[in-house]
Each structure stands twice: as structure tokens, then as C-alpha cells.
Amino acid sequence: MELSALTAVSPVDGRYGSKTIALRSIFSEFGLLKYRTIVEIRWLQKLAATAEIAEVPAFSAEANQFLDAIAANFNEADALRIKEIERTTNHDVKAVEYFLKEKVAAMPELHAVNEFIHFACTSEDINNTSHALMLKEARDTVILPEIRNVIDAIRKLAEEYRDIPLLSRTHGQPASPSTMGKEMANVAYRMERQYKQIANVEILAKINGAVGNYNAHLSAYPTVDWHKFSEEFITESLGVDWNPYTTQIEPHDYIAELFEAVARFNTILIDFDRDVWGYIALGHFKQRTIAGEIGSSTMPHKVNPIDFENSEGNLGLANAVFTHLAQKLPISRWQRDLTDSTVLRNLGVGVGYAIIAYTSTLKGISKLEVNRDALLAELDHNWEVLAEPIQTVMRRYGIEKPYEKLKELTRGKRVDGEAMRQFIDGLALPAEEKTRLKAMTPASYIGYAIELTDKL
């Protein structure tokens, strides 16, 4: 069977492949080979730009342009050639080195220094830097923009529904009212915090040899300040943050930090998906139907909240992958073992499930239509929620056992507006307070909900 959306083992590349297409050039085998090629080229250029390394003379503009073009124009044919070389070497990083030696053979200036490709590097020097570039691009060009889309959509709901009253539920039971907009604002605020934390994670990399001490570097060029050289290469040539203290491998703590931050965002989104699912079940939201769609194979009337359910399921898968990556990657025996290698090939899997989920949530949000009449009817059926403000005012004016009196009137009972007004009339309260309390309804008892939403 040829690999296609129909034959792919994983739905990330199969059924949902159209939603994850932006990740292919980043997290695929092609992506890894592309980043390895970029790192090797930038390393050679850095060596040539260092006067103390006389054996690699400063490159001409043409030579640098030649190398830059290899990096910028890396394509599937290049990746296939590397894989062809790997069939002989049985070593994926060495195959990239040999591929570049083939490429530079066309330019005598570069061919003369081809043994400085991969100079003093261990494979992990190339791999960890490639993963850093991979994760930086994924975070900055895919993950954060998609998260921003979700947050902005929820912010829009907050603005649109800022003044639509909602019966709150604590422990599933009627509680003091809010507004639908304020509940959306609560979610958006939580998500904004996680967005900032994801954006602020330092993407770390190292290039310091087989055990992190520049042993090979110093043996060849003992007068070069390799520690400084390494920092400049990581921060300037590659544009990521430098980790100066490592073993053979960059310890991957930052990957754990990044994915744990994304997982926290995902957990908040699961909470949102479930709440909206519940609001749909209660009739607080209606879902706009799409012509031709079928909700059930046997019940023609069904309009199911499938987008929020799909999102919740995929977020669970994403977080399961992220959790394993965060727990496993920072652990490596002594100066390194190879258990991280196969795990690192799955960086895109968790991200893929997350992107699928974000897309589904956005689709679900686009179908939502608030059912104002149902919300108001529910509030009008739960006048007992005004027991809280009444007993609180009673406390202010020193009325004995206010809580207990309201408990006797309302706990486990349905009371209407007239019953509440009669109770208020019987209280020893100033006339203006009685008037204010009797004018209050469940729909108007929303505190600062609107103001807080507007301040988001």
C-alpha cells in the first residue's frame, strides 16, 4: 500500500492530515534533515569567520551564498539523497555530513575545507540544535498562532455575551448568577497566562562535544575560547538560547517546560469544551446546523456537540504524549543513553493532536448561538438564588439569624418572586432597602460580571 490519508497508521497524518499540514515541514523526517543541514552549514560558516582557525579561511561572498542557498532551498530530493546515503552509513547524522560534502564538491573553495563539515561535533550537537530550531519554529509559527485564535474566539464570545445573565452552578446546583460573557472571560484570562508562559520558555541548545567539555575542540585549537564560540554560535548563528552546562546531550528540561505549559493550556481548553458541552445540553446554547450534516445514523433529529467532543478527545491524547515527553526526556543515564532518541522523534505527535483539537474547538465555537430565552426562563425558575443577597443585607442591619431564616425559606425548595417579596416585606429593614431588594431579580443579581468582562 502507498502511504496516503487512507493508509496512514496515525490519524494525525491520515484522517486529520489536512489540519496538521503546517507541521509536516517542521516535525517530519524531512524537517529534521532540513534543520540538521542548516546547523551543519552554519557551523562551517562560523568556523570560517574565526581568524584563529586559519585552516578554514574566511569564505568569499560567493561561498557563503552557495551555502545559504543549500539551506534555503533544501527540498525533498535533498532529503531523499540523505536517506540514500544513510542506507550505506547506517548513521543518519553522518549521512548529512556526506551529503554536504557532495554538495560543496561543486565549489573548489568549499571543497578544500570539506573535512571541517561536522568538525569536533558529536551527533547530539547537531541533533539538539536541530530540535531547538524545530521547536522554536513550531511554537512561534504554529502553536502560538493557533492558541491565539482560540483565545480570540473566546474573547469574542465574552464581548458578545457580556450582559446575558446566566444561572451559575456550583456542585451542579443553582448558585449566584453571572453572565455568559463573564464565564467566557474567566477562560480567556486563564488562557492568556498560559500563552505568555509558552511564549517565554527558553529554547535551549548546546554545541560542546561528546561529553560537554569541548575535549576535541581544545585538542585541535587550544587557543580558541570555545566556550564563548559556542555561545555565539547558539545565540547568534542559530537564534536560540545557550545552555553552557551539559553532558553529551542537552538535558531537555526546556522541552519539558514547553510541553508542560502547552499541556496546561490544553487542560484549560478541556475545561472549556466540557462546560460548553454542558451548556449545550442544558439548552443555553443552540448549534447552527450545516446543510447535509447528519448527527446520528438512527436519530434524524440529533445535532450533537461533536466539535467540542473531538477537541476534548484529542487534547487528552496530546497531553498524554506531552506528559511522557516531559517525564522521560530530562532523564538520561550518566553522560547519555539513547532512550531519548526514539522519543524525540515524536515531538510532533503531541503537537499534532493539539492542533487538531484547537481547530475543532474553533469550529464548534463558530456554530454557537446563545439561547437568551432559555437562560432567562431558567433564572426566573430559580428565585431562591436571591437568598444570598437578602441574608447579606439582613446581616448588615443586625437582624437575628438571617442565614437560618433564608435557609428555612429556600433550601431544597422552589420559591417564586412573590414569595421572596413577601418575605422581604416582613423584615425590619429600612424602606429604601426593602425597595431595592424587591426590585432585584435573578437576572439582575450579577454583581460586577459585566464590568469585569469589559476590563478583560
Swiss-Prot record:
One of its GO terms (biological process) is 'de novo' IMP biosynthetic process. It catalyses: N(6)-(1,2-dicarboxyethyl)-AMP = fumarate + AMP; (2S)-2-[5-amino-1-(5-phospho-beta-D-ribosyl)imidazole-4-carboxamido]succinate = 5-amino-1-(5-phospho-beta-D-ribosyl)imidazole-4-carboxamide + fumarate; (2S)-2-amino-2'-deoxyadenylo-succinate = dZMP + fumarate. Disruption phenotype: A reduction in the expression of purB leads to a reduction in the efficiency of infection by a Vibrio phage. This is Adenylosuccinate lyase. PANTHER family: ADENYLOSUCCINATE LYASE. N(6)-(1,2-dicarboxyethyl)-AMP binds at residues 15-16, 90-92, 122-123, 248, 297, 302-304, 310, 336, 341-345. NCBIfam families: PRK09285.1 (NF006764), purB (TIGR00928). It holds the Pfam family ASL_C. The keyword Lyase applies. Gene3D superfamilies: Fumarase/aspartase (C-terminal domain) (1.10.40.30), Fumarase/aspartase (Central domain) (1.20.200.10), Fumarase/aspartase (N-terminal domain) (1.10.275.10). The gene is purB. The active site is at H171, S296. It is an enzyme of class 4 (lyase). Homotetramer. InterPro entries: Fumarase/histidase_N (IPR024083), Fumarate_lyase_CS (IPR020557), Fumarate_lyase_fam (IPR000362), Fumarate_lyase_N (IPR022761), L-Aspartase-like (IPR008948), Pur_lyase (IPR004769), PurB_bact (IPR047136), PurB_C (IPR013539). Catalyzes two reactions in de novo purine nucleotide biosynthesis. Catalyzes the breakdown of 5-aminoimidazole- (N-succinylocarboxamide) ribotide (SAICAR or 2-[5-amino-1-(5-phospho-beta-D-ribosyl)imidazole-4-carboxamido]succinate) to 5-aminoimidazole-4-carboxamide ribotide (AICAR or 5-amino-1-(5-phospho-beta-D-ribosyl)imidazole-4-carboxamide) and fumarate, and of adenylosuccinate (ADS or N(6)-(1,2-dicarboxyethyl)-AMP) to adenosine monophosphate (AMP) and fumarate. It comes from the Bacteria. Belongs to the lyase 1 family. Adenylosuccinate lyase subfamily. Its EC number is 4.3.2.2. Keywords: Lyase, Purine biosynthesis. Pathway: Purine metabolism; AMP biosynthesis via de novo pathway; AMP from IMP: step 2/2; Purine metabolism; IMP biosynthesis via de novo pathway; 5-amino-1-(5-phospho-D-ribosyl)imidazole-4-carboxamide from 5-amino-1-(5-phospho-D-ribosyl)imidazole-4-carboxylate: step 2/2; Purine metabolism. One of its GO terms (cellular component) is cytosol. GO terms for molecular function: N6-(1,2-dicarboxyethyl)AMP AMP-lyase (fumarate-forming) activity.
